[in-house]
Amino acid sequence: MKLFLYHFTFIVYYFIISFSYAFSIKQEIIVSSHNASSILNTTAFWFVEFTESKYDKEEFSVIWNEVSMEFPDIRRAKVFCDLDLEFCAQQEIYDHPKVVVLKNGMWMRHVLEKNQITTKSARQFVKSHLGNCDLEQAENETDCFSDDGEYNSDSSSTDPAFELKEDQSWKHSSILRPLETLNFKRFLFGNEIMSKTRAFVMFVSLKHCEDCFHWEAVWSSITRNTDERLKMAQVNCDEEKEMCNHFHIKKFPTFRVFQGFDSIQYNGPLKYQQLLSYSNQVASYQAIKIEEGDIESIENSHPVFFLVLYDFATTSEDFSIIERLKLQLAGVAPLYICNSKALANKYGAQSQPSIIAVRNGMPIVYQAITPREFRDYKRITEWINIVSSPFITELTPTKCHSLLNRKLTVLTLLQPDSEQFFSSQEELLRLGKRWFRFQMQRQRNDIVWSRIKKYSAIAEAKKKGFARKVKRIKYSKISHPTYTESVSFLWLDSSLWLDWIVENLDHTVYVDSITPPVFVIDHSKGVIYVSDRNGNSLTLEEDSLFSTLRIILEHPNSSRLQKLRAPGLCPNGSPNYRNRYKLIVFNLLIALLILSILTIISASRLSRRRRQLLNKQPVFGFYHSLVIAKSD
């Protein structure tokens, strides 16, 4: 009986001690959007663990729970970001698990990351935020408790429970500007930096790029000198592989401009001044509303500009696509908006809203039959890439890839210090405009021919009495293809391109000639045309040049050509994948042919050997040809 009372007393005492210890520990609360005010609107400080439900029993959570139980008076909270992603995004928490300290409703910079978690580091992290204990004391394992086991605090009840320097990183500074660091979840779900403004993002990879660590300092300098209306950010592709694969980032560093979920890649030179100039252009680019009388001065001051004409019936969906076009046109050409019927008649816009590109005073109207085609963002961007350059421009290494985007390029060698320079430029511009009119007339003829075929088919169906066929053809739509250009007109300074000219052309003929020389390059085939069909050198004479261009486009093998001996006009040009694939297919066919020949030779030798074995067998009739008789 005494033994039973002894055991019963021990169990009761054990439960009393356990319950008293358990109730002395402040319970951890689960925080979400509906009860976030319980910690955000208090003056106390909290140790908040941001994690996911699948991480709740992993090493980080286990160590943090064990260490936090050693400090029963601290306030603990937990947020499951996979269950409440919006709340974590609002608090700018995108990487977890981690522990963040909340002081007076503000998040502190000193956090406990997943890669830092050990029992010692977690204990130091807690001690550095308690009482009079600072981080140095915590790292030296100095005890932060008084002799009676309570936290040592000389401050009053109204003072904060710990002393830390104020976090200044969030404050605005005109000298230092913070650089955003993005990850894929922040891009998809926490899109607050890209929803209302543009963002210029650098993609780097320290594993695949040897000099990318230099670019981090350069990018920080560009960030400080860029207009604050443009957000600046960077992405480390070693950690954010999913985001880099989403945007097909293969080279480093790569720069992209974002506006919402639209993006465009920067293809200019990777130089500090050019990147800084482009970033400021993107930051300040806006559509300018003009009046009818302003158009003349705009035509005289801009070789290329874009004009949007609208009326009272223009919808918000139409204006939204115009807003998205700013991303494509930033740093390329100005964008103007006007409500004028007179300008619509001047530029040949038959309906509103209309998008018009004006190059050297000549308009090109974006052809859209239905509202859906007008709001087709991909179709408009393809059209902008074609019409965003003037009819003639100088070929420079920095703009080389963007200018050589046609099938054929007409290049004229000019010397800026010669007397014929300006007259030759005007003649080349006249040829460019004439060729543009020729292309536009050809496209109109194609549309007219399509209409003739449609009406002829309707008449034929009516004649045969096919009512259903007549109805089907009548309501079929005649497609207006997107405007394309097959020829670009460029001029280059012969002194700057001297090495390329010597490598590919006759130096004496093409540099010392009084008449500006002209030649045509086909980039897809890597060939150059220096003469017409009759063997005469190409010049700026319209009939000869245009007839040569038409012959090359329709019958490319009928004109005299020579192969380009240099890799191409553009330095470090992109490889010609078409020729590369041709070479791969050719090598594969050669390999298959060789394999077939070897197979035939092996089969013939094997059959010959079998015939020889058959001839050596006994000639008796009861012996099989494959049986070898063994005799003693």
Swiss-Prot record:
**EC id:** 5.3.4.1
Coiled-coil parts of chain: none
| MF GO annotations | protein disulfide isomerase activity; protein-disulfide reductase activity
Q: Which reaction does it catalyse?
A: Catalyzes the rearrangement of -S-S- bonds in proteins
Which cysteine pairs are joined by S-S bonds?
C209-C212
TM spans (from-to): 583-603
One GO cellular component term noted in the UniProt record for this chain: endoplasmic reticulum
Question: Main subcellular localization, coarse class?
Answer: endoplasmic reticulum
In this protein, which residues make up the domain named Thioredoxin? 153-284
Q: Which residues form the signal peptide?
A: 1-22
Report how it sits in the membrane: Single-pass membrane protein
Glycan-carrying positions: N35, N41, N140, N557
Domain of life, per the record? Eukaryota
Do you know which PROSITE patterns this protein is assigned to?
A: THIOREDOXIN_2
Q: Which UniProt keywords apply?
A: Chaperone, Disulfide bond, Endoplasmic reticulum, Glycoprotein, Isomerase, Membrane, Redox-active center, Signal, Transmembrane, Transmembrane helix
Q: Which CDD domains match?
A: PDI_a_family
Respond yes or no to whether keyword Disulfide bond is given for this record. yes
Compartments, record wording: Endoplasmic reticulum membrane
Q: Which GO terms describe its biological process?
A: ERAD pathway; polyamine metabolic process; response to endoplasmic reticulum stress
Which InterPro entries does this UniProt record tie to the protein? Thioredoxin-like_sf, Thioredoxin_domain
Q: Briefly, what is this protein's role?
A: Acts as a membrane-bound chaperone in endoplasmic reticulum quality control. Probably facilitates presentation of substrate to membrane-bound components of the degradation machinery.
- Name the family: Belongs to the protein disulfide isomerase family.
Q: Tell me what this protein is called.
A: Thioredoxin domain-containing protein C959.05c
Q: What is the species listed in this Swiss-Prot or TrEMBL entry?
A: Schizosaccharomyces pombe (strain 972 / ATCC 24843) (Fission yeast)
